[in-house]
């Protein structure tokens, strides 16, 4: 039976300290956020990255087309305006789950922070009117990472 002879996807190991963080695209962030793409998976439409977020930095408004999970390893992250505006505030160390369709206005980091996140499906960045301006899935994340990594080399 041919379906049993599918090619096995190779395992991966990434030693984070062996790679340089590169700037996350400024069109989707503010304040100098850097990142490393750790894995992209066409077979599951997922991508995993680690982000360094300086104090005062933020991600632009976006919608999670698919669910995502994060682990805040350092700092503080205010989602949907933080607790003071009815959203969530994560304090390290913290785990979070983002459901499909979750709408986030600016995600803000009031102190130096770092988090690891796996996205299942694309992240849709939106303008002030809620119109999607960019959809970042595994292929786009991989392309941005490779382009920026090659520029930095």
UniProtKB/Swiss-Prot annotation:
Main role? Cleaves acetylacetone to equimolar amounts of methylglyoxal and acetate, consuming one equivalent of molecular oxygen.
Cofactor binding: number and manner:
Binds 1 Fe cation per subunit.
Which cofactors? Fe cation
Q: What does the record give as the organism's lineage?
A: Bacteria, Pseudomonadati, Pseudomonadota, Gammaproteobacteria, Moraxellales
Q: Which Pfam families match?
A: Cupin_7
Could you give the subunit structure recorded for this chain? Homotetramer.
Is Metal-binding given among the entry's keywords? yes
Its EC number(s): 1.13.11.50
Q: Does the keyword Lipid biosynthesis apply?
A: no
Q: Which reaction does it catalyse?
A: acetylacetone + O2 = methylglyoxal + acetate + H(+)
The molecular function terms of the Gene Ontology recorded here are: acetylacetone-cleaving enzyme activity; metal ion binding
Matches recorded under InterPro entries: ChrR-like_cupin_dom (IPR025979), RmlC-like_jellyroll (IPR014710), RmlC_Cupin_sf (IPR011051)
Name the pathway: Xenobiotic degradation; acetylacetone degradation
The protein's UniProt keywords, in alphabetical order, are: Dioxygenase, Iron, Metal-binding, Oxidoreductase
UniProt name for this protein: Acetylacetone-cleaving enzyme
């Amino acid at each position: 039976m041919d379906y049993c002879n599918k090619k096995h996807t190779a395992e991966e190991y990434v030693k984070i300290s062996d790679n340089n963080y590169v700037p996350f695209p400024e069109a989707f962030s503010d304040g100098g956020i850097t990142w490393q793409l750790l894995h992209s998976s066409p077979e599951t439409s997922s991508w995993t990255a680690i982000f360094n977020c300086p104090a005062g930095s933020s991600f632009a408004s976006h919608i999670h087309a698919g669910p995502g999970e994060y682990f805040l390893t350092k700092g503080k992250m205010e989602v949907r305006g933080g607790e003071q505006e009815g959203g969530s505030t994560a304090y390290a160390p913290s785990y979070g789950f983002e459901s499909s369709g979750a709408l986030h206005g600016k995600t803000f980091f009031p102190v130096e922070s770092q988090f690891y996140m796996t996205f299942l499906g694309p992240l849709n960045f939106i303008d002030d009117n809620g119109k999607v301006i960019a959809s970042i899935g595994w292929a786009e994340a991989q392309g941005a990472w490779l382009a920026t990594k090659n520029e930095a080399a």
